[in-house]
Amino acid sequence: MSDSKPRDVQVLPIATNTKVLRARSWSRLRFEIEYALERGTTSNSYVIEGDKTAIIDPPVESFMKIYLEALQQTVNLKKLDYVILGHFSPNRIPTFKALLELAPQITFVCSLPAAGDLRAAFPDDNLNILPMRGKETLDLGKGHVLKFLPIPSPRWPAGLCTYDVQTQILYTDKIFGAHICGDDVFDDNWESFKEDQRYYFNCLMAPHAIHVEAALEKISDLQVRLYAVGHGPLVRTSLIALTQAYADWSKAQKDREISVALLYASAYGNTATIARAIALGLTKGGVAVKSINCEFATPEEIQTNLEQVDGFLIGSPTIGGHAPTPINTALGIVLKVGDNNKLAGVFGSYGWSGEALDMIEGKLRDAGYRFGLDTLKVKFKPDDVTLKFCEEVGTDFAQTLKKAKKVRVPQQAATPVEQAVGRIVGSVCVITAKQGDVSTGMLGSWVSQATFNPPGLTVAIAKERAIESLMYPGGKFALNILSEGNHLEYMKHFRKNFAPGEDRFANFTTTEADNGCTVLADALAYVECSVDQRLECGDHWVVYATVDNGKLLKPDDVTAINHRKTGNHY
């Protein structure tokens, strides 16, 4: 998305007495991993006007000014009765303060945990708060009777869905959303951004799939014609398909053979941001993630999860030279459970010295735990490159666990089918991709021309590859085609295990393509590509891309071919 477009607010009727206010950012809003596709985002708020008026989910501070201007042109704030919260977030507090100045009569409607958060955020104010535990309703008049469904999760302990009986709209807050900005208010062209919906799920929902399943169960009895989501296009055309997809994706997470507990607490949100990036890497690596926010989890919940998983990571900030109480409690439970056959890891954000991380690592080491990663210390707020590094750390941790499991399985001889498939050959290439400051590359031989007009190709990429998260529709990459004779050095180099964040091209002479991706000076030829679409195929993604540019560098050379004897590995 272009950075040149200013932020704005779309206002549109979506049902009887109901409007959406979509605050739009065309560029990347924040550095959190869920925004990494750089499609922009929308923060959707809603207005229901019965005999009484309610707004749902006013946005964060960065949208506050333009949102309040649009809201005042939409409703008379002196007659605003309710502000309904799908979740509580500290970066919404300035918006709440501004609303209270403009409409001091408002009553906040929220879950019970959010009520406590509001009172803590406004200790000197006697706020009007109406907590919803799940059985209450709110009658706005003119048929708009609202039902409330608490949907807590480790990321959003105060989660709450709202259902309007008359319009049959379910206000889902974080569920079913996508971080994408455009002119389409509804999802009528949902096929064009379904990968954004999947990426959003992988980042935000996969680490607590069991809570997603619980939420789906709660809404299953409702007659719903529209999901009024918190981010992205409102869901109507793909409602049934997306609901089923959420169920399938959640089940797939739960059914994974290997699982990891991700225990964390966060002082300023930075350690939680790191945890989400690691969780995405773990998910890509093929393990189930059980995300546990230690500030809200009970000791029994922590212990039960620790007993069930194959490995765990503990994330902690350092506050006054120490770990916060919830982390000390969790660490005590880890040491009490005492199963040092489980793979361990430590991570966190710190401001000055990070003593908490050293303390946690030391106690785990003294207890005999093996570590699946070097303790990951991030100073202050992670940037885009750091988050990509954290994602790769998670993938490496997952692969280490999976290798440990495979050791116990005897190596099987290739079957006749695998031997036959192994005779399918492909040109040896190095695929490079770049997005912002993040750059990476991989060896690939599962490459094939796919179309004449436009010129296009397909490339198969394993799900756990670091480059995978840069290969979404709209992404750019370069395909470096290698020559017969000089390809073996590249194959040896790119087949090794790279450390997270390691420069893949440090030993080679390179230039930069017009699209910003790395070109190997010793390549036979290269083509610059734009990802058009991708298809999930078992343990790989098949990416179709159109060719934008290219150059033959060595006209007299012959393309290197990768000859194999089995189709069960590269």
Curated annotation (Swiss-Prot):
Residues 38-231 are annotated as: Zinc metallo-hydrolase. Its EC number is 1.-.-.-. Gene3D superfamilies: 3.40.50.360, Electron Transport, Fmn-binding Protein, Chain A (2.30.110.10), Ribonuclease Z/Hydroxyacylglutathione hydrolase-like (3.60.15.10). Keywords: Electron transport, Oxidoreductase, Transport. Residues 260-402 form the Flavodoxin-like domain. Binds 2 iron ions per subunit. Its cofactor is Fe cation. InterPro entries: Flavin_Rdtase-like_dom, Flavodoxin/NO_synth, Flavodoxin_CS, Flavoprotein-like_sf, Metallo-B-lactamas, NADH_oxidoreductase_modular, ODP_dom, RibonucZ/Hydroxyglut_hydro. Pfam families: Flavin_Reduct (PF01613), Flavodoxin_1 (PF00258), ODP (PF19583). It comes from the Bacteria. Residues 421-570 are annotated as: Flavodoxin-reductase-like. By homology with NorV in E.coli, may be involved in nitric oxide detoxification. Mediates electron transfer from NADH to oxygen, reducing it to water. This modular protein has 3 redox cofactors, in other organisms the same activity requires 2 or 3 proteins. In the N-terminal section; belongs to the zinc metallo-hydrolase group 3 family. In the C-terminal section; belongs to the flavodoxin reductase family. This is Putative diflavin flavoprotein A 5.
